[in-house]
């Protein structure tokens, strides 16, 4: 945000009393007040009101680009505002951080599980979960340029590595190949967000040709032509494994009837983020084991 704030002087917004945690404050931007000065809005601890205010600003005259931010878990509190934004085709932007069990010790009350599927179920909402800093740049680009509906960004709390082959521009296509074997792929790993790094590490350890697909936005991928979708996910490759730290609901659209999902079908746990992720199977070793078992089953 600091990098592009000078180029987006009409962008205003803030957080539901979590600006320091979500990192969504324009430094030096001042606080919006009765004099209408400042770009930072102090919404207070009231997520639904924040969403409604963001929608109202978006409705005003189209001159301002409003955003509201909180933890992803608290998107439940503002769901109706998000739905109205989608229904009304507003240019509202929602920035949700702390997007998985990887957030750590705050535990199940703060760890999103069903939220990816729930938010993807809202028609006309772009839900983007970038893998690293490069994809986050691309996600912001989509968010600032998209018309005809709201955009939601789901970002991690934990640090993630900058990956070698991620692309800012490719985010606009919803999904793309970040790793391909020398030979035709026999297994495809499909991941979103911080789990893309796990998929890439697993692919390095696989003894069969394995493709890795980053899928930051289902909705944008669905809007691509069938030729591109089949190029990314060849129909003849049935051994497809999704890797996402949430429920598997909806993933069979992409992994197919014979594919499998590494998912979380229960509430989280209070422990350091890496410990929770390892406990729930988000390790390269587990991905390799699941992928090889899937390939064997599909091939038999």
What role is predicted for each listed range?
Residues 1-300:
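Thiamine diphosphate
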């Amino acid at each position: 945000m600091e990098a592009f704030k000078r180029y987006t002087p009409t962008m205003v917004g803030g957080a539901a009393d979590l600006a320091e945690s979500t990192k969504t404050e324009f430094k030096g931007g001042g606080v919006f007040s009765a004099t209408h000065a400042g770009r930072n809005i102090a919404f207070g601890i009231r997520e639904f009101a924040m969403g409604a205010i963001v929608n109202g600003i978006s409705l005003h005259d189209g001159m301002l680009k409003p955003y509201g931010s909180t933890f992803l878990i608290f998107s439940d509190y503002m769901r109706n505002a998000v739905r109205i934004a989608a229904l009304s085709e507003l240019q509202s932007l929602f920035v949700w951080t702390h997007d998985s069990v990887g957030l750590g010790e705050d535990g199940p009350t703060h760890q999103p599980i069903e939220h990816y599927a729930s938010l993807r179920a809202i028609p006309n909402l772009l839900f983007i979960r970038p893998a690293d800093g490069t994809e986050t740049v691309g996600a912001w680009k989509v968010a600032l340029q998209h018309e005809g509906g709201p955009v939601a960004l789901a970002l991690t709390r934990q640090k993630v590595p900058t990956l070698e082959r991620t692309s800012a521009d490719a985010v606009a296509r919803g999904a793309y190949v970040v790793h391909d074997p020398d030979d035709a792929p026999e297994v495809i790993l499909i991941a979103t967000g911080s789990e893309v790094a796990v998929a890439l590490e697993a692919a390095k350890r696989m003894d069969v040709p394995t493709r890795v697909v980053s899928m930051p936005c289902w909705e944008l991928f669905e809007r691509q032509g069938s030729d591109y979708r089949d190029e990314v996910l060849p129909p003849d490759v049935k051994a497809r494994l999704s890797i996402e730290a949430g429920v598997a609901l909806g993933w069979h659209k992409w992994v197919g009837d014979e594919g499998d999902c590494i998912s979380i079908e229960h509430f989280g746990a209070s422990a350091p983020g890496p410990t929770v992720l390892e406990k729930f199977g988000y390790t390269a070793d587990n991905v390799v084991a699941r992928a090889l078992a899937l390939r064997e089953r599909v091939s038999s």
